[in-house]
Amino acid sequence: MIEKIVKESEKGILIDIEVTTNAKKNEIGKINEWRKRIEIRIKEQPIEGKANKAIMKFLKGIFKSEILINSGTTSAQKTVLIPDKTKDDIVKILKKEIKSI
């Protein structure tokens, strides 16, 4: 399932995520198999881009790479871009981080 969520593109690796804001802590949750997205919980509220900034900072810490929001800047369903990692690198990191694997 994780291989369907992590995709290669010309610009880098794309990951489909679903964001829950106002969480107790920043964390990667489980895979939402119905939506084919990884659940990300963020403490910040979606006000004036604070949640998007928190998502990028949180994921940058996990992937040790630049993170860009490719689509969904105003939606809970987003696609993030990681320009300088391979799909294999990302899948390995996610398998360690995701709670349902």
UniProtKB/Swiss-Prot annotation:
Gene3D superfamilies according to UniProt: YggU-like (3.30.1200.10)
GO cellular component assignments: cytoplasm
Name of a matching Pfam family: DUF167
InterPro entries (UniProt xref): DUF167, YggU-like_sf
Superkingdom assignment: Archaea
Record-linked HAMAP family: UPF0235
Family to which this protein belongs: Belongs to the UPF0235 family.
Name this polypeptide is given: UPF0235 protein MmarC5_0538
